[in-house]
Protein backbone atom coordinates (compact mmCIF):
# COMPACT_ATOMS: atom_id res chain seq x y z
CA UNK A 1 0.00 0.00 0.00
CA UNK A 2 2.90 2.35 0.81
CA UNK A 3 4.20 1.87 -2.74
CA UNK A 4 0.80 2.77 -4.15
CA UNK A 5 0.83 6.09 -2.31
CA UNK A 6 4.40 6.81 -3.41
CA UNK A 7 3.36 6.23 -7.01
CA UNK A 8 0.26 8.40 -6.56
CA UNK A 9 2.37 11.24 -5.14
CA UNK A 10 4.79 10.96 -8.05
CA UNK A 11 2.00 11.13 -10.58
CA UNK A 12 0.51 14.18 -8.88
CA UNK A 13 3.87 15.92 -8.92
CA UNK A 14 4.20 15.23 -12.64
CA UNK A 15 0.63 16.18 -13.49
CA UNK A 16 1.79 19.34 -15.26
CA UNK A 17 3.14 17.12 -18.02
CA UNK A 18 5.22 14.11 -18.79
CA UNK A 19 8.90 14.14 -17.96
CA UNK A 20 10.99 15.28 -20.91
CA UNK A 21 14.54 14.79 -19.59
CA UNK A 22 15.00 11.53 -17.72
CA UNK A 23 18.06 10.04 -16.06
CA UNK A 24 17.85 6.36 -15.15
CA UNK A 25 19.90 5.15 -12.20
CA UNK A 26 19.04 1.48 -12.68
CA UNK A 27 19.60 -0.68 -15.77
CA UNK A 28 16.30 -2.48 -15.13
CA UNK A 29 14.43 0.84 -15.20
CA UNK A 30 16.31 1.83 -18.35
CA UNK A 31 15.06 -1.39 -19.94
CA UNK A 32 11.51 -0.52 -18.86
CA UNK A 33 11.81 2.94 -20.44
CA UNK A 34 12.90 1.28 -23.69
CA UNK A 35 10.01 -1.21 -23.51
CA UNK A 36 7.64 1.74 -23.11
CA UNK A 37 8.98 3.34 -26.29
CA UNK A 38 10.31 6.38 -24.42
CA UNK A 39 14.04 6.15 -25.21
CA UNK A 40 13.90 9.68 -26.64
CA UNK A 41 13.31 11.03 -23.12
CA UNK A 42 16.48 9.49 -21.67
CA UNK A 43 19.37 11.95 -21.31
CA UNK A 44 21.64 9.88 -19.04
CA UNK A 45 22.02 6.44 -17.50
CA UNK A 46 23.90 4.62 -14.80
CA UNK A 47 26.45 2.18 -16.17
CA UNK A 48 25.77 -1.43 -15.35
CA UNK A 49 26.18 -4.32 -17.69
CA UNK A 50 25.80 -4.29 -21.42
CA UNK A 51 24.10 -1.25 -22.92
CA UNK A 52 21.26 -1.74 -25.38
CA UNK A 53 22.04 -0.22 -28.79
CA UNK A 54 19.20 2.30 -28.36
CA UNK A 55 21.11 4.05 -25.57
CA UNK A 56 24.68 3.42 -26.66
CA UNK A 57 25.55 7.11 -26.98
CA UNK A 58 23.88 8.38 -23.81
CA UNK A 59 26.14 9.94 -21.19
CA UNK A 60 26.96 7.94 -18.09
CA UNK A 61 26.30 9.46 -14.67
CA UNK A 62 28.30 6.84 -12.78
CA UNK A 63 27.96 3.23 -11.77
CA UNK A 64 26.14 1.26 -9.10
CA UNK A 65 26.61 2.94 -5.73
CA UNK A 66 28.64 5.83 -7.17
CA UNK A 67 26.62 8.51 -8.90
CA UNK A 68 28.44 11.57 -10.22
CA UNK A 69 26.00 14.26 -9.03
CA UNK A 70 27.73 17.05 -10.93
CA UNK A 71 27.45 15.14 -14.21
CA UNK A 72 23.84 14.21 -13.45
CA UNK A 73 22.86 17.82 -12.71
CA UNK A 74 24.56 19.02 -15.91
CA UNK A 75 22.01 16.94 -17.82
CA UNK A 76 19.16 18.97 -16.27
CA UNK A 77 16.76 16.07 -15.72
CA UNK A 78 13.17 16.70 -14.73
CA UNK A 79 12.80 13.08 -13.56
CA UNK A 80 15.28 10.61 -12.10
CA UNK A 81 14.48 6.90 -12.01
CA UNK A 82 15.92 5.22 -8.93
CA UNK A 83 16.27 1.71 -7.57
CA UNK A 84 16.92 2.35 -3.84
CA UNK A 85 20.10 0.28 -3.60
CA UNK A 86 21.69 1.91 -6.64
CA UNK A 87 22.22 5.27 -4.93
CA UNK A 88 23.56 5.95 -1.43
CA UNK A 89 20.93 7.52 0.83
CA UNK A 90 22.99 10.71 1.24
CA UNK A 91 23.02 11.24 -2.53
CA UNK A 92 19.32 10.45 -2.75
CA UNK A 93 18.66 13.16 -0.17
CA UNK A 94 20.76 15.65 -2.14
CA UNK A 95 18.69 14.91 -5.24
CA UNK A 96 15.54 15.54 -3.22
CA UNK A 97 17.06 18.81 -1.97
CA UNK A 98 17.56 19.93 -5.58
CA UNK A 99 13.83 19.49 -6.14
CA UNK A 100 14.11 17.01 -9.00
CA UNK A 101 11.22 14.55 -9.21
CA UNK A 102 12.25 11.02 -8.26
CA UNK A 103 10.56 7.82 -9.40
CA UNK A 104 11.63 5.36 -6.74
CA UNK A 105 11.06 1.79 -7.90
CA UNK A 106 10.69 -0.45 -4.90
CA UNK A 107 8.09 -3.11 -5.65
CA UNK A 108 7.54 -5.66 -2.89
CA UNK A 109 5.41 -8.04 -4.92
CA UNK A 110 4.75 -9.00 -8.52
CA UNK A 111 1.48 -7.04 -8.38
CA UNK A 112 3.39 -3.95 -7.28
CA UNK A 113 5.82 -4.48 -10.15
CA UNK A 114 2.91 -4.47 -12.60
CA UNK A 115 1.59 -1.26 -11.01
CA UNK A 116 5.06 0.25 -11.24
CA UNK A 117 5.24 -0.41 -14.99
CA UNK A 118 1.92 1.37 -15.50
CA UNK A 119 2.99 4.30 -13.28
CA UNK A 120 6.29 4.63 -15.13
CA UNK A 121 4.41 4.79 -18.42
CA UNK A 122 2.22 7.54 -16.98
CA UNK A 123 5.23 9.51 -15.72
CA UNK A 124 6.84 9.31 -19.16
CA UNK A 125 3.74 10.35 -21.08
CA UNK A 126 3.28 6.80 -22.34
CA UNK A 127 0.23 5.83 -20.26
CA UNK A 128 -1.23 3.45 -22.85
CA UNK A 129 2.12 1.73 -23.37
CA UNK A 130 2.47 1.45 -19.59
CA UNK A 131 -0.93 -0.20 -19.30
CA UNK A 132 -0.08 -2.59 -22.13
CA UNK A 133 3.29 -3.50 -20.59
CA UNK A 134 1.66 -4.02 -17.20
CA UNK A 135 -1.03 -6.22 -18.75
CA UNK A 136 1.58 -8.20 -20.71
CA UNK A 137 3.56 -8.77 -17.51
CA UNK A 138 0.44 -9.92 -15.61
CA UNK A 139 -0.54 -12.22 -18.48
CA UNK A 140 2.93 -13.74 -18.53
CA UNK A 141 2.72 -14.41 -14.80
CA UNK A 142 -0.76 -15.92 -15.23
CA UNK A 143 0.52 -18.23 -17.98
CA UNK A 144 3.43 -19.36 -15.82
CA UNK A 145 1.12 -20.08 -12.90
CA UNK A 146 -1.19 -22.06 -15.18
CA UNK A 147 1.67 -23.97 -16.78
CA UNK A 148 3.19 -25.05 -13.48
CA UNK A 149 0.08 -25.31 -11.31
CA UNK A 150 0.21 -29.10 -11.11
CA UNK A 151 3.96 -29.41 -10.64
CA UNK A 152 5.30 -30.25 -7.23
CA UNK A 153 6.88 -27.23 -5.58
CA UNK A 154 10.66 -27.19 -5.68
CA UNK A 155 12.47 -27.90 -2.44
CA UNK A 156 15.37 -25.68 -3.34
CA UNK A 157 15.61 -21.92 -3.14
CA UNK A 158 18.52 -20.03 -4.64
CA UNK A 159 18.77 -16.45 -3.41
CA UNK A 160 20.78 -14.05 -5.53
CA UNK A 161 20.36 -11.03 -3.29
CA UNK A 162 18.77 -10.51 0.10
CA UNK A 163 17.10 -7.19 -0.82
CA UNK A 164 15.56 -7.51 -4.30
Could you describe each region identified by the protein language model?
Residues 12, 40, 51-52, 74-75, ...:
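Generic signal for short, ordered secondary-structure residues
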Residues 18-21, 89-164:
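Extracytoplasmic substrate-binding proteins
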Amino acid sequence: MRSFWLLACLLLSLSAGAAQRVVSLAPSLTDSVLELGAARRLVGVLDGGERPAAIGDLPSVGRYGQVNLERLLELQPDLILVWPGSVPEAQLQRLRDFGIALFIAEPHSLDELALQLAALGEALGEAEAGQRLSARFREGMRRLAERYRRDKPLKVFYQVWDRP
